[in-house]
């Protein structure tokens, strides 16, 4: 290898390391920012590993998610900020723009609306805002979106139940929901699966049973 080529490689590595250090510093600044903590958002970056960022978002008051804490996994890609972070909900949530099964998020700034001027702060605050303003017309989870549109009270009660069970809120839930979950558990269905089956069938026990055993 020629000296000039080696020098170019070393220069490229140095620039990559500088870019990584700059991005890491900026992400840490977001994690420690007062507006983030005041909004009820906590960020953990383990050992400067931008592939292992955890966000914890408190559910906004006045929503079915109030009282819950939702964990989000964030990965900062190699070409950030020229491509968006990858984010998904680790804590399960009943929301039309978030998959109830995988935590995949439908949010435009995580896709085609991302620009290099946006930041990790923007992502976290936008995710929290999304809990206040679901968009069922552009869903990630079609089942949740259908319930939101056709039976909003049922959607709200279901979202409250999921927030209580998965996100540890202290909100009161529909007693009848607990009874129906108990019935499925007695039949050998695991509790988490029972909640999902009933939620997807508007908490109609017979309909859920037909879905399970057909």
UniProtKB/Swiss-Prot annotation:
<dbReference type="InterPro" id="IPR000608">
    <property type="entry name" value="UBQ-conjugat_E2_core"/>
</dbReference>
<dbReference type="GO" id="GO:0005634">
    <property type="term" value="C:nucleus"/>
</dbReference>
<feature type="domain" description="UBA">
    <location>
        <begin position="172"/>
        <end position="214"/>
    </location>
</feature>
<dbReference type="InterPro" id="IPR016135">
    <property type="entry name" value="UBQ-conjugating_enzyme/RWD"/>
</dbReference>
<keyword id="KW-0833">Ubl conjugation pathway</keyword>
<comment type="similarity">
    <text>Belongs to the ubiquitin-conjugating enzyme family.</text>
</comment>
<dbReference type="Pfam" id="PF00179">
    <property type="entry name" value="UQ_con"/>
</dbReference>
<feature type="domain" description="UBC core">
    <location>
        <begin position="21"/>
        <end position="168"/>
    </location>
</feature>
<feature type="active site" description="Glycyl thioester intermediate">
    <location>
        <position position="106"/>
    </location>
</feature>
<dbReference type="GO" id="GO:0005524">
    <property type="term" value="F:ATP binding"/>
</dbReference>
<dbReference type="InterPro" id="IPR015940">
    <property type="entry name" value="UBA"/>
</dbReference>
<dbReference type="GO" id="GO:0000209">
    <property type="term" value="P:protein polyubiquitination"/>
</dbReference>
<keyword id="KW-0067">ATP-binding</keyword>
<dbReference type="GO" id="GO:0061631">
    <property type="term" value="F:ubiquitin conjugating enzyme activity"/>
</dbReference>
<dbReference type="InterPro" id="IPR023313">
    <property type="entry name" value="UBQ-conjugating_AS"/>
</dbReference>
<keyword id="KW-0547">Nucleotide-binding</keyword>
<comment type="function">
    <text>Acts with E3 ubiquitin-protein ligase trim-21 to catalyze the 'Lys-48'-linked polyubiquitination of ced-1, promoting its proteasomal degradation to maintain appropriate ced-1 levels for apoptotic cell clearance.</text>
</comment>
<dbReference type="InterPro" id="IPR009060">
    <property type="entry name" value="UBA-like_sf"/>
</dbReference>
<protein>
    <recommendedName>
        <fullName>Ubiquitin-conjugating enzyme E2 21</fullName>
        <ecNumber>2.3.2.23</ecNumber>
    </recommendedName>
</protein>
<keyword id="KW-0808">Transferase</keyword>
<comment type="pathway">
    <text>Protein modification; protein ubiquitination.</text>
</comment>
């Amino acid at each position: 290898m020629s000296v000039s080529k080696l020098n170019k490689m070393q220069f490229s590595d140095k620039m990559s390391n500088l870019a990584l250090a700059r991005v890491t510093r900026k992400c840490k600044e977001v994690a420690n920012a007062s507006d983030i903590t005041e909004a009820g958002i906590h960020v953990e970056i383990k050992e400067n590993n931008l592939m292992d960022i955890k966000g914890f978002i408190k559910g906004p008051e006045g929503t079915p998610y109030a009282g819950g804490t939702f964990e989000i996994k964030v990965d900062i890609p190699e070409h950030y900020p020229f491509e968006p972070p990858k984010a998904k909900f680790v804590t399960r949530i009943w929301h039309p723009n978030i998959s109830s099964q995988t935590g995949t998020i439908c949010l435009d700034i995580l896709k085609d609306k991302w620009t290099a001027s946006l930041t990790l702060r923007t992502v976290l605050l936008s995710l929290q805002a999304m809990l206040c303003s679901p968009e069922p017309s552009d869903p990630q989870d079609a089942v949740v979106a259908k319930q939101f549109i056709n039976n909003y009270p049922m959607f709200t009660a279901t979202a409250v139940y999921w927030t209580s069970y998965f996100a540890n809120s202290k909100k009161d839930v529909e007693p009848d929901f607990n009874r129906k979950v108990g019935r499925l558990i007695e039949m050998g269905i695991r509790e988490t699966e029972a909640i999902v089956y009933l939620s997807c069938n508007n908490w109609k026990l017979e309909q859920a049973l037909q879905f399970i055993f057909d």
